[in-house]
């Protein structure tokens, strides 16, 4: 039987500003990537998101981003590997505190936005991020773009890794995501998202914007919590995965059996 983890970026509200339908989406995902205050989120939002996920048995991970609230962490910054290491250690620590306060454990770490995309193609940056995760807790699972430099860095240092694919993003022929600056970067159709996910899970391939089948490994599927169709996508993808005979379960549970 095919198995897949379904994850979502959550806890991205800030102060009086509400982003996403976290409580509803948590009914359909198996892993939650929780913002740690740099690109989004704040201490109160983090605490509340941890509680919501725990109530539903959803596994949790840190979602560290660049220090860019205005740009939601989606703008590139010129940072050194040492700075990346510090940013990731700091943000893992922030979420870890809230989890420990409730007797809970962290499952994974997934960088956010520009940090994620930069690390996908930059070996030095990805090595620094993987080192940060490993030094904090070598038992954590590192999420990264499927078969990217970040996944390779995690494997080199001895971390468990998860090759991540996206339900709501289009791909280029080199396996990278289409930049958000391009008009065709986002998938808006429920049917298109479902078709892409099932193809990635069952066939290990995705149709690129250039019309080519690109091979990739799918361990976990991401739905962006701030997307306009996030809840609908989560509902339909979960339903259609089941119909296709694909078991949806948290990545850590897959690997403990």
Curated annotation (Swiss-Prot):
Keywords linked to the UniProt accession: ATP-binding, Hydrolase, Nucleotide-binding
Biological process according to GO: carbohydrate metabolic process
Highest taxon, organism lineage: Bacteria
Enzyme Commission (EC) number: 3.5.2.9
Molecular function GO labels: 5-oxoprolinase (ATP-hydrolyzing) activity; ATP binding
Consequences of knocking out this gene: Deletion mutant grows less well than wild type on minimal medium with ammonium as nitrogen source and cannot grow on 5-oxoproline. Mutant lacks 5-oxoprolinase activity and accumulates 5-oxo-L-proline.
UniProt key word Membrane: no
Pfam families: LamB_YcsF (PF03746)
Catalytic activity: 5-oxo-L-proline + ATP + 2 H2O = L-glutamate + ADP + phosphate + H(+)
Similarity comment: family membership: Belongs to the LamB/PxpA family.
Role according to the record: Catalyzes the cleavage of 5-oxoproline to form L-glutamate coupled to the hydrolysis of ATP to ADP and inorganic phosphate.
Subunit structure: Forms a complex composed of PxpA, PxpB and PxpC.
The name this protein goes by in its record: 5-oxoprolinase subunit A
Lineage: Bacteria, Bacillati, Bacillota, Bacilli, Bacillales
